[in-house]
Amino acid sequence: MEDHKISMEKIVSLCKRRGFVFQSSEIYGGQNGAWDYGPLGIELKNNVSRAWWKEMTQLHDNIVGLDAAILMHPRTWEASGHVENFTDPLVDCKKCKSRFRADHLPPENLEKRICPDCGGELTDTRKFNLMFKTHIGPTDDNSSVIYLRPETAQGIYVNYKNIIQSNRMKIPFGIAQIGKAFRNEIVTKNFIFRTCEFEQMEMQFFVKPGTDDEWFNYWKKQRWAFYEKYGVRTNKLQWHQHGKDELAHYAKDAYDIEYEFPMGFKELEGVHNRTNYDLTRHTEYSGKDMQYIDQDNGNEKYIPYIIETSAGLTRNVLMFICDAYDEEKVADKGNDDDWRTVLHFHPNIAPITVAVLPLMKKDGLAELAEEIRNELKEEFKTDYDQSGAIGKRYRRQDEVGTPFCVTVDYDSKEDNTVTLRFRDSMEQVRIPRTELIARIKTEIKNYKRV
């Protein structure tokens, strides 16, 4: 596979054309910063979230799951610092009314207060809180103010003692959660990379102070290995350590895994040592004791340190599409038909695992293909396509990342065999129908991206 640059325009076009992602409320002109996931997009998103969930809660015995409410007591966000500090610096153009994050403007524009779009005068910089504020109940005053959560982590912290008591958890242990978060971003851009409504995959790992550096390094290795496991090209990944000017006030250390998107290297996931800041703050604001009692060490009491892994699910979806996307020349005849667009998804995250394709609609081939599809349905997400030349049908499946195609032809009726085609190599093998499921499972287990 060639390593070449792709444009975001091509990614957006493919996503809309093939039903991965649509602009929200498109018939009304679209809602800025909001996107809908189509039939293939939701399958891909669900597969990515399942892969992450398995990695955390199934393969680690000391991590359990949680699904906390989106609406939380407003004191939660006072304790976390979001009410006071969750802000971005905002400037407006007095002429064209465009809005910008001041820290994202070229220094000369900010210094001279010149709009980069129209040359108009910019306003003074002011703080803009990113939390969506609403009201709960029948009144509309300060007593009914509530927020849409800007992150999922706080739901884990406020349930930390509940989970210790109900599940008899002992440190070190983790709590994993996948859920929606909302941020009133000044500027939403780059398709689904930065949006107002998004999903996070977060795991908070509670450790004894003094062991935090060891666990921090452990989770750095684990999270990098996750992307390797699902076929992401490591030359497209890099670590970025937060400098003193980037490090959050509560963090002891923080690293981002960055991926080279079409717009450059951008954050994909963060691994953070949050110390005991969050639990200490919730102790202060709630009046509840958040100390851990270590019964294995003479009932020693301490507030745990927290190692956080925080990834954007929707951002991961974009990354997997970008990383899988390729345009390949498949023949040397010098015309456009000899190129194919292909998505090299790992089979475990591909929206469709197997497509069943009858060579012809007639002579009972379609009925036989439907029988075979019904057998495969119990094990895999399948598709069925009987329209057009077989070569064009292969191309359609390549374009959405289907790793395996099963072709049913006239020989299938005679000897009960089928052709199994592999997306990446385009090679084909003839196998007995009775061995099809086992062969596909073996291919998935042994899959290595070329």
Where are these regions (language model features)?
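NTP/phosphate- and nucleic-acid-binding module
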Residues: 1-450
